[in-house]
Amino acid sequence: MPELPEVETVRRGLEPVLSGARLSSVRANRPDLRFPLPDGFVQRLTGARILRLDRRAKYILAPLDRGDTLVMHLGMTGRFEIAAPEGTVRPGDFAREVTPDDKHAHVVFQTEDGATVTYFDPRRFGFMDLIPTDRVSHHAWFAAMGPEPLGEGFDARTLEKAFANRKQGPKTLLLDQRTVAGLGNIYVCEALHRSGISPFKPSGNIAKKRLTPLTAAIKDVLAEAVEVGGSTLKDFAAADGALGYFQHRFRVYDREGEPCPTPACKGVIAREVQAGRSTFFCPVCQV
């Protein structure tokens, strides 16, 4: 599933085409994705102007001039194709370029400027909704979300409060969207390794002085991933078709059996299943 850097990469790819654009037509080729499309979806969007493109956690938000916000989530395999007057760019399929199958083209947006943005989703785990803009922060998807990890509201004090007296490992708590918004398995594994913290250590036993380096590692690994367009693994591609390259910088994720890259560490990267997900870590230098 695309994580925060991948979603931010898609948002940035869509922004030049959709931010400020008026939708001349909208077509929904089916009544549902993961969830049914909202009542009047096409009518409420047609003729509306998209004021800007935002991101909250793994959601792309498009506030409209009519008082609603279009909320989009990519799910597992959602992607966009942009066809502009200067040409069409098709998205890749993580590790290779593919031509999207038209049978998976579920929603098509056309702008007054002549651009067509098509949402493809073979597995239909993504979804779209229209929420009154002044109610977005109160919606069930967002009301309990923690701070954005790249924002000023996320710091060591956030983790100190979330970890206090908790027996769960830090990975489990960092994946909880109530702790911090948008973190996923890949980047939590990478940040914990950079900060030398075991994903299994009871969070309440982690010394407070270690939380500042952990916070910095989370911010650094996300910023680096956004800079290079996210990680190309299986289904993610940027809106302009570019593939992400952060996977080439992985230190532990999907590196089972390889030497730990930490200088002077003699450990070997291991993998264990934790809460149904693969956890990659160094059993020597992560304590």
UniProtKB/Swiss-Prot annotation:
Domain of life (superkingdom): Bacteria
Catalysis performed (reactions): Hydrolysis of DNA containing ring-opened 7-methylguanine residues, releasing 2,6-diamino-4-hydroxy-5-(N-methyl)formamidopyrimidine; 2'-deoxyribonucleotide-(2'-deoxyribose 5'-phosphate)-2'-deoxyribonucleotide-DNA = a 3'-end 2'-deoxyribonucleotide-(2,3-dehydro-2,3-deoxyribose 5'-phosphate)-DNA + a 5'-end 5'-phospho-2'-deoxyribonucleoside-DNA + H(+)
Name recorded for this polypeptide: Formamidopyrimidine-DNA glycosylase
InterPro entries linked: DNA_glyclase/AP_lyase_DNA-bd, DNA_glyclase_Znf_dom_DNA_BS, Formamido-pyr_DNA_Glyclase, FPG_cat, MutM-like_N-ter, Ribosomal_uS13-like_H2TH, Znf_DNA_glyclase/AP_lyase, Znf_FPG/IleRS
GO BP terms in the entry: base-excision repair
ZnF (FPG-type) residues: 251-287
Family: Belongs to the FPG family.
Function field: Involved in base excision repair of DNA damaged by oxidation or by mutagenic agents. Acts as a DNA glycosylase that recognizes and removes damaged bases. Has a preference for oxidized purines, such as 7,8-dihydro-8-oxoguanine (8-oxoG). Has AP (apurinic/apyrimidinic) lyase activity and introduces nicks in the DNA strand. Cleaves the DNA backbone by beta-delta elimination to generate a single-strand break at the site of the removed base with both 3'- and 5'-phosphates.
GO terms for MF: 8-oxo-7,8-dihydroguanine DNA N-glycosylase activity; class I DNA-(apurinic or apyrimidinic site) endonuclease activity; damaged DNA binding; zinc ion binding
Residues annotated as catalytic: 2-3, 58, 277
SUPFAM superfamilies recorded: Glucocorticoid receptor-like (DNA-binding domain), N-terminal domain of MutM-like DNA repair proteins, S13-like H2TH domain
Assembly and oligomerization: Monomer.
Keywords noted in UniProt: DNA damage, DNA repair, DNA-binding, Glycosidase, Hydrolase, Lyase, Metal-binding, Multifunctional enzyme, Zinc, Zinc-finger
Name of the coding gene: mutM
HAMAP family the record matches: Fapy_DNA_glycosyl (MF_00103)
Pfam family, one: zf-FPG_IleRS
Claim: S-adenosyl-L-methionine is one of the keywords in the record: no
Entry note: cofactor: Binds 1 zinc ion per subunit.
The organism of origin for this protein: Caulobacter vibrioides (strain NA1000 / CB15N) (Caulobacter crescentus)
EC id: 3.2.2.23, 4.2.99.18
Residues the record lists as binding DNA: 104, 123, 166
Cofactors that this protein relies on: Zn(2+)
NCBIfam families: fpg, PRK01103.1
